[in-house]
Design a protein with these regions (language model features):
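Gly/Ser/Thr-rich active-site loops/lids in small-molecule metabolic enzymes
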Residues: 137-152, 181, 185, 210-233, ...
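A structural-propensity feature for long, helix-poor, extended segments
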Residues: 150-174
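N-terminal glycine-rich phosphate/adenylate-binding segment common to multiple enzyme folds
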Residues: 74-144
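Terminal amphipathic helices with adjacent charged low-complexity linkers/tails
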Residues: 34-70
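Single conserved hydrophobic/aromatic residue that forms the stacking wall/gate
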Residues: 1-8, 13
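Histidine-anchored nucleotide/phosphate-binding helix
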Residues: 23-47, 181-185
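Active-site rim loops that border cofactor/substrate pockets in soluble metabolic enzymes
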Residues: 84-86, 91-104, 108-109, 164, ...
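Short, glycine-rich nucleotide/cofactor-binding loops
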Residues: 14-25, 165-176, 205
Length: 290
């Protein structure tokens, strides 16, 4: 369903590369996407191993393309391009070694137009999935930072949380960009974004540098994206509970019904999405790099 959202979005996603081609969850997803004609799928791995894993799980991957990074006919061009992108930080030999790993290979495949997006993290750590993208794919025009958000799903309900993975202690201006880009991502996944700029304070009820940072960022967001529904600084309970919102933030178009949550730093964000996932029954999808 999340992949379907991407295909129907303005991002024009048509082909997706999966870095862990033998993982059961990946193969199940590839089977469904290709059988339903939703998306073209590229699976990375040794063909015999990928096919054996698919057969063991009774998944039909006949419509998928399988690429072995260690036996790719276009590897020389890929090496040359990656050496150029790394600007002297890696030798030819180091680049070839990196590209033998599916996380780097998949990222370069996207960079060179062989796929529109990459999905990884089934067995790779978040750091190992994100690092190649940070090194090889630059920010889009107008963006100053790379950030991230998670989409959390529970039944038919979807919410977004950012930045849970990249920026440790974002500045006011960083928070502005994180909020605006997270809202855009939320919209892609079918969420009508109502953005809560989270804090331990609601509209001046508390004091401190973090409160000031979030409050100032909220003002800047309203100036930069006046069409975006945003409230802050605001406590979490006031952002989701209509009863609390009526007391702490009356008349707000966001308070009590927020669905896109921007945290003041990575400590709060990472803890927050994991609490939602482990105790709240949400499935976390991400991090989506913005």
């Amino acid at each position: 369903e999340m992949q379907r959202s991407l295909v129907g979005s303005e991002m024009c996603i048509r082909d997706s590369v999966y870095t862990e081609g033998t993982d059961k969850r990946i193969l199940e997803s590839a089977h469904r996407l290709t059988q339903e004609g939703i998306l073209g799928v590229v699976l990375l791995g040794k063909p015999e191993e990928v096919k054996a894993a698919a057969k063991a799980g009774n998944f039909n991957i006949d419509a998928c393309q399988i690429i072995d990074p260690e036996n790719y006919e276009g590897i020389d061009a890929m090496v040359a391009e990656m050496v150029k992108l790394r600007k002297g930080k890696m030798t030819d030999e180091q680049v070839r070694a990196a590209l033998s790993k599916s996380n780097y290979f998949g990222t370069m495949l996207v960079k060179m137009g062989g796929a529109d997006c990459l999905l990884g993290g089934a067995t790779y750590s978040t750091a190992d999935t994100v690092r190649p993208a940070l090194q090889l794919i630059k920010t889009k025009p107008g963006n100053n930072i790379v950030s991230s958000c998670f989409i959390l799903v529970r039944g038919d309900e979807k919410i977004a949380m950012g930045d849970c993975a990249i920026n440790i202690d974002p500045s006011e201006d960083d928070l502005v960009e994180i909020a605006i880009e997270s809202a855009k991502t939320a919209k892609i996944f079918g969420i009508d974004p109502k953005v809560a700029m989270l804090s331990y304070s609601t509209l001046g009820s508390g004091k401190g540098p973090s409160v000031t940072k979030v409050a100032n960022a909220t003002k800047k967001i309203k100036e930069a994206a006046p069409e975006l529904a945003v409230e802050g600084e605001i406590q979490f309970d006031a952002s989701v509970s209509p009863e609390v919102a009526e007391v702490k933030c009356p008349g707000s178009p966001v308070a009590g019904q927020a669905n896109t949550f921007i945290f003041p730093d990575i400590n709060a964000a990472n803890i927050g999405y994991k609490i939602a996932s482990r105790l709240g029954g949400y499935t976390a999808v991400g991090p989506c790099l913005l």
